[in-house]
């Protein structure tokens, strides 16, 4: 029998002949307190390897130890915990509960509930929902969803708007979102109670109908009720902070907060400085839009070689004011004046913008059902129930079956029952309220147990033939909003090197006309449209080409003369090329390759 290697934190430290006994002995020592409870040990018999981990940073979770088919945690322990005679640490010290990492959990046989324990089980879940993290733990009835949907929701929860910090009014975060009327979810989980999610909720309870609406909610688009939005549904504020400091430079020069004078290099128009106070800083509650100056600032010149007509060095200051970002607007929310570590003056301006949901804003339920707003409909045109209930949101029925997010269907049923009974429903995965109890609550309040109702067309007033599934679901507004993403450009800055438009919304860049778009125009035979996009509207350049040698010729502006650097006296002709092509020729020359352009008469 080959010896089993033992690794500690990935380093080989020795071997042993009886691996099963060794691992069992180490676990006993850990449970009795002889070895640190933070140690985890795993045996891989097929590889003849034992791994021991003690390093920090491992994700570990608590489980109840099971021995001989019986959990070590008894009713007596639970009573002592309730009275305070025992604490959590006492349970660990007594070897009743232990923490396992991912490696050791690989070889553990964990029971979900005490009823299913047999002689082979090694551990028992404290509660089945504890296997989920914080983000996945807020999903009600998560055990009824497919795992990719739960994974998606765990990611999107972090993007949901809510009360991100209770002291948001005292902070100057670079960017921040704040939901105006966050609500606690009607359908909750035990992890929501444990984590204090109710203190900082990040969503609202929507009345949701599952039906199509004129095709405007196909492909996960959502239909929103305009009246609900006007009442404040999913309304939020966006905060952006700007800052500037009076930096000091070698030679005693420094930046200054002031309203720049007209002689300053880079001076803007007077209207751009209209909101500034005498000290060069904007007043609170001023309404600003992109390009408006928030902090008027001038800086010393970069170079001191400029000599005026009297022979002295001229100090012509530069305009370096802080302006509102391109494409943004808002109201100055707060102005903070303080000092940097070096003792220079520091100004911070926070601008707020109120945002009502609009077409293209992203929403998601707690079951990975994400979608963007496809249409905002007046309340009088929305469908309504026999009781006069108008849904806040309409989602497409196609979003449910293939994704198997049955948890959302159950949440809508539970939310409806909770609203009628004036209580919150426990939707904890595996151990929440039973589906039959929820259906019974609906029946007791005069509703169909399947959650369907007869709806009437808001436009014609006729009863819709199909019965519509309608209920209450918790929806989250995510920070992906149209206002931050919509962009168009007709003219703007170009790059110095390639003379092509810059890239990106923040830099007022162009929209890339890529290879695939080019191929489409080629396939259509739209030659002039292709030339317009890729040449005329991009980086058109008139290059002079020598007729004899095919080299790029030079134009001497002072002597008003065109000449070839090689042939000198030969004739040269203007040729329209892309500047990127001219740049390529220059780079080939730097590699000692002689590119020649052969000229022909224009047809």
UniProtKB/Swiss-Prot annotation:
GO biological process: DNA-templated transcription
PROSITE patterns named in the record: RNA_POL_BETA (PS01166)
Sequence positions that bind Zn(2+): 546, 549, 564, 567
Subcellular location: Cytoplasm
Keyword Nucleus: no
Catalytic activity: RNA(n) + a ribonucleoside 5'-triphosphate = RNA(n+1) + diphosphate
Key words of the record: Cytoplasm, DNA-binding, DNA-directed RNA polymerase, Metal-binding, Nucleotidyltransferase, Transcription, Transferase, Zinc
SUPFAM superfamilies from the UniProt entry: beta and beta-prime subunits of DNA dependent RNA-polymerase (SSF64484)
Chief subcellular location: cytoplasm
General function of this protein: DNA-dependent RNA polymerase (RNAP) catalyzes the transcription of DNA into RNA using the four ribonucleoside triphosphates as substrates. The Rpo2 subunit (Rpo2N and Rpo2C in this organism) is implicated in DNA promoter recognition and in nucleotide binding.
Description of how the protein assembles with itself and partners: Part of the RNA polymerase complex.
Protein name: DNA-directed RNA polymerase subunit Rpo2C
Organism of this sequence: Methanothermobacter thermautotrophicus (strain ATCC 29096 / DSM 1053 / JCM 10044 / NBRC 100330 / Delta H)
Organism taxonomic ancestry: Archaea, Methanobacteriati, Methanobacteriota, Methanomada group, Methanobacteria
GN (gene name): rpo2C
